[in-house]
């Protein structure tokens, strides 16, 4: 069940990026607020890809943008190599921008339609005063070639003259041009055809190895996330439910919501029965007035009175290694001696 806690965090010296107790609220008028992200924590080691999954409205894209400080978190820490980005402002924050970049969902609208692609890719270098004009030109040619775009065509054509897949390649080139450490990939293939998706995913893996990147991969396609991620975190209504290595999490889903997501993946075989055991009905509750205790309890077939009273905390799954879950009544055993019980739910 959706909860909080930091038991799953690794030692600070082992990670590049650490997000702890992150909260992102938006005003909703009449003194109300939308709780988009509510007290979640996770970390990412250098060279790792963390997949963030969940249904629409769970807060995964907002989490990615909050890492970028766009928007600024309401509370919590985003620590990049010992520096809390949430505590920076002005020029100090601005100077961290080259270290974190983003690839957006819509590859065409994320590029300036009035400029050539080569100019768009070069712009970050100009902003930061990196290199001479000739050095910048060579860098742009190098990166465009690496993503599979002809530099000559890029210098002559604007975004609308490229296909969607080519525009996403251009977006990737723009993201890596400043040699960032972390790239937030916000559903980078969801707007593309299936055949093109595979090409872009392979390109991201290639660029990750070539430039030593660390990725946060936001997506709703569980099959895609499994293939590209080193760890997967499942979110529901602004909370984190479960986190672990993809092979472990997909083979032994321990949170009822994770099991429901996996059971919803269509199997192209008419002889295979639909998994009704983990079916979840109903609608996502309002983030303006989320349920007390566990936020998933209103749709969970295993929910009991405790779930309404106490928010569950992250706890290790038995024999799960780096597999953690926040649930009072998990589908798999948890480590003996641990407890999922957290603070009482707010009235």
Language model features with spans:
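Short catalytic/signature loops enriched in Gly
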Residues: 2-15, 29, 33, 243-347
């Amino acid at each position: 069940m959706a909860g909080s806690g930091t038991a799953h965090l690794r030692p600070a010296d082992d990670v590049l990026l650490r997000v702890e107790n992150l909260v992102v609220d938006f005003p909703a008028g009449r003194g109300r607020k939308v709780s988009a992200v509510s007290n979640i924590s996770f970390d990412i080691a250098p060279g790792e890809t963390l997949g963030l999954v969940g249904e629409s409205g769970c807060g995964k894209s907002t989490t990615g943008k909050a890492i970028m400080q766009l928007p600024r978190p309401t509370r919590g820490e985003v620590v990049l190599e010992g520096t809390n980005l949430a505590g920076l402002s002005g020029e100090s924050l601005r100077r961290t921008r080259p270290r974190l970049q983003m690839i957006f969902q819509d590859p065409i609208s994320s590029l300036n339609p009035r400029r050539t692609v080569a100019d768009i890719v070069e712009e970050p270098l100009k902003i930061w005063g990196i290199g001479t004009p000739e050095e910048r030109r060579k860098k742009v040619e190098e990166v465009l070639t690496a993503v599979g775009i002809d530099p000559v065509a890029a210098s002559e054509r604007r975004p609308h003259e490229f296909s969607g897949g080519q525009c996403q390649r251009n977006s990737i080139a723009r993201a890596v041009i400043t040699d960032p450490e972390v790239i937030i990939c916000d559903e980078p293939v969801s707007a593309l055809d299936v055949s093109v998706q595979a090409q872009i995913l392979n390109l991201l893996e290639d660029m990750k190895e070539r430039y030593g990147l660390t990725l946060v991969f936001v997506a709703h396609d569980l099959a895609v996330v499994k293939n590209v991620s080193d760890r997967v975190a499942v979110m529901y209504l602004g909370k984190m439910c479960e986190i672990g290595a993809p092979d472990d999490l997909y083979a032994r889903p321990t949170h009822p919501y994770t099991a429901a997501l996996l059971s919803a993946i269509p199997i192209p075989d008419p002889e295979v029965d639909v998994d009704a055991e983990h079916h979840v009905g109903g609608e996502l509750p309002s983030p303006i007035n989320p349920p007390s205790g566990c936020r998933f309890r209103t749709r969970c077939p295993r929910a009991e009175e405790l779930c309404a009273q106490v928010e569950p905390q992250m706890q290790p799954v038995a024999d799960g290694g780096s597999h953690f879950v926040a649930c009072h009544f998990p589908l798999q055993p948890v480590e003996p001696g641990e407890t999922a019980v957290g603070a009482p739910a707010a009235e």
